[in-house]
Amino acid sequence: VADHKVHDLTPEEVSKGMADGRYLLVDVREPNEVAAEAYSDGVVVPLSSFDPQSIPDPKGKQVVFACRSGKRSVTASLAAQAAGLPYDKHLAGGILGWKAAGLPTKTGG
């Protein structure tokens, strides 16, 4: 078994990568959390029913997992790697860190 690692990215790195078209943000929080407050861009693949195959084709982008605080995103990355996908990045600090960095979120679905 390969020794899977998950690389931490800062909110600033992820925001810039998304703006540059290099990163696809995959939010693994639950639908009720996403409805209350969401990242400004990205796709939602809840960890509770996580299937690495359900992640959309990133079309050349690098997948970055994100959650509330940075724990579930690590779990999702390790699960994706175990399924043979090269998705080894996550947003350290989650949406809490994202907001602390002054980055935009959207509310109300």
What are these regions (language model features)?
Residues 1-24, 31-62, 71-109:
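Rhodanese-like catalytic fold shared by cysteine-dependent sulfurtransferases
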Residues 66:
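Short, surface-exposed ligand- or partner-binding patches at beta-edge/loop junctions that are enriched
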